[in-house]
Amino acid sequence: MSAFKKSLLVAGVAMILSNNVFADEGHGIVKFKGEVISAPCSIKPGDEDLTVNLGEVADTVLKSDQKSLAEPFTIHLQDCMLSQGGTTYSKAKVTFTTANTMTGQSDLLKNTKETEIGGATGVGVRILDSQSGEVTLGTPVVITFNNTNSYQELNFKARMESPSKDATPGNVYAQADYKIAYE
């Protein structure tokens, strides 16, 4: 093979390889977020912003029974150090609050989709404790830790309700904030 052909071959291979080096075959950005909190337990990633799917409930159920079946949800605590600095923690106090309650129903979360096109009316969302007792918004629910493990579960439920039995079909969305205190 002549020197010219060898040079041409080397140049061709170099061009092919250089195209792969400079070709953009996909790119993106990875963002990381978190927060350091002063507490004996960490909240499991993803549980700081939960979504509870209450499903599709027939309006006839809400008009007759006034309530849907309750759907469970859990706030998971991890990396718990329940004994530290002479203090032992045996309970979590979870307080739910909201700026939007149904008129005349201070413990029923308002459907904020109610005023939008396609929003259900006459429907709110009720938070329940693990035993299906109604949670009073703004009042702590005390949960005793079941052991001294570093992993704990705070179990609750939620359901749709129509106290006036006049629910209309449509989308339902409600929101509550929660805070955890330890004792």
Swiss-Prot record:
Disulphide-bonded residues: C41-C80
Protein name according to UniProt: Uncharacterized fimbrial-like protein YgiL
Signal peptide: 1-23
Organism whose genome encodes this protein: Escherichia coli (strain K12)
Main location: other
Keywords in alphabetical order: Disulfide bond, Fimbrium, Signal
InterPro entries referenced in this protein's UniProt entry, alphabetically: Adhesion_dom_fimbrial (IPR000259), Adhesion_dom_fimbrial_sf (IPR036937), Adhesion_dom_sf (IPR008966), Bact_Fimbrial_Adh_Pro (IPR050263)
Similarity remark: Belongs to the fimbrial protein family.
Compartment(s) of residence: Fimbrium
